[in-house]
Amino acid sequence: MIDLLLPLTDIHRHLDGNIRAQSILELGHQYNVTLPARDLEALRPHVQVTKNEPDLVSFLQKLDWGVSVLGSLDACRRVAYENVEDAVKAGLDYAELRFSPYYMAMNHKLPVAGVVEAVIDGITAGCRDFDTDIRLIGIMSRTFGTEACQQELDALLSQRDRIVALDLAGDELGHPGALFTSHFRQARDAGWHITVHAGEAAGPESIWQAITHLGAERIGHGVTAIIDPRLMTHMAENGIGIESCLTSNIQTSTVESLDKHPLVHFLRYEIPATINTDDPAVQGIEIRHEYEIAAPLAGLTAVETRKAQENGLNIAFISEQEKQQLREKVLRKRGTA
């Protein structure tokens, strides 16, 4: 269960994986994009997981329709704004939204730097209108290769003060982290935090690589850490967090079933592991589902679920002062200061 006196966070949430089906339909019409269906219910199976996908790449294809309708920078601004509204409606007190500007730009050949600026504009307007706190993590989509990732990084660096961290996502098996060491050196030089998708499609060596070569402070998914006790000890001792996404890992067939998910073991190993959504619109779930349905099925006790909720703020990419201010704000709103 969710502890209402603690801030509720989602620190692994893809902006470009959370484009509303209704918005896809409307933007598709606006920008003359031929979609696989003309009404909402017929479109839904194409843009939302209805059964578990055979692998990560198949799952990621569900995201493609969402970005296919981003026909202008205004469209990017709109979906960013709607992401903030969705986060607030989900009950989140704090979220880190991650996005790949190259992925969002490529279908309509939008300027990548312009996409970054449009997303920032949409998030800023949303935070103002809905009185919430959202931070942005830039993604390099490794699937498109090192050169495209450098374009993406350059665009993100042009707004370096509005981005809190850099991530690497996409085809983990085909494009290992070692190819991107220079990119992450630039990110660290810019003062950014580092989180990396690793140990989702590949083994624990991918997580080691993210930590030792790329400087990862947090690992996205990280499920294969469970087969390397030395790695788990290293992560626990060094406070390297795991951004767990329970339902997502089942839908991508990364983990066979929730009762076999390693999150509970990570928590018992004292790794600062957290509960997150991943791509809510594509998955057809929200953060409450992860806490109230997925976590118990994954074997977490109420105490362990609360610990994961605490971890979400503890390893967030904001200052200790900002974390304390958020705790106090939640207590004022839902309890007693």
Curated annotation (Swiss-Prot):
- Disulfide-bonded cysteine pairs: these are none
Q: In which domain of life is the source organism classified?
A: Bacteria
GO molecular function annotations of the record = 2'-deoxyadenosine deaminase activity; adenosine deaminase activity; zinc ion binding
Q: What is this protein called?
A: Adenosine deaminase
Binding of Zn(2+) occurs at: 12, 14, 197, 278
GO cellular component term, pick one: cytosol
Record keyword Metal-binding present: yes
What the entry lists under HAMAP family is as follows: A_deaminase
Q: Which family does it belong to?
A: Belongs to the metallo-dependent hydrolases superfamily. Adenosine and AMP deaminases family. Adenosine deaminase subfamily.
Q: Where is the active site?
A: 200 (proton donor)
Q: Which residues bind substrate?
A: 14, 16, 170, 279
EC category name: hydrolase
Q: Name one GO biological process term.
A: adenosine catabolic process
Is Acyltransferase a UniProt keyword of this protein?
A: no
Enzyme Commission no: 3.5.4.4
PANTHER family linked: ADENOSINE DEAMINASE
User: What cofactor does this protein call for?
Assistant: Zn(2+)
Q: Which UniProt keywords apply?
A: Hydrolase, Metal-binding, Nucleotide metabolism, Zinc
Catalytic activity from the UniProt record: adenosine + H2O + H(+) = inosine + NH4(+); 2'-deoxyadenosine + H2O + H(+) = 2'-deoxyinosine + NH4(+)
